[in-house]
Design a protein with these regions (language model features):
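N-terminal "arm"/small-domain region of PLP-dependent enzymes with the aminotransferase-like
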Residues: 1-58
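Conserved core of the PLP fold type I
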Residues: 57-139
């Protein structure tokens, strides 16, 4: 039995990550476009990950409540106004799904993060772009 995929997927380009410095024949280059750090994680971070790994057999706090409380306290905010996710792409998907209805228009500047158009289309909304000028400002 074949699985029928949503037609909208035909309009969305396949993600192609940028080439690595090795693929380009570059030495001592840093690839910033993939949000990769050129430095190894600090020992304290490695230790925290190792400690957390001891609880991998348990579901985490789904709503990340304690982290939201801690961040809110640090910045003087109400925890209800703090959202934590697996990255900006994941958070963007959540926001678009929560806010947009079919046919809504979502305005954003171009050039921009490639995920904007994809997430807007997947939510059934219509992307509307506003190009930036040569100084990366709105006209």
């Amino acid at each position: 039995m074949a699985v029928k995929l949503r037609e909208i997927l035909e309009t969305i380009p396949v993600y192609r990550p940028g080439e690595s410095p090795d693929e380009c024949g570059l030495e001592n280059a840093v690839k910033l476009s993939s949000n990769e750090s050129p430095w190894e994680p600090p020992a304290s971070v490695v230790a925290a990950v190792q400690e957390a790994a001891l609880e991998l057999n348990r579901y985490p706090d789904y709503y990340k409540e304690q982290l939201c409380i801690d961040l809110a306290s640090c910045y003087g905010l109400d925890p209800a106004w703090v959202s934590v996710d697996n990255g900006s792409g994941s958070l963007l998907q959540d926001v678009v799904r929560i806010v947009c209805d079919d046919g809504d228009e979502v305005l954003y500047s171009t050039p921009t993060f490639a995920a904007y158009e994809i997430d807007v289309k997947l939510a059934g909304a219509k992307p509307v772009t506003c190009p930036l000028d040569d100084s990366y400002r709105y006209d």
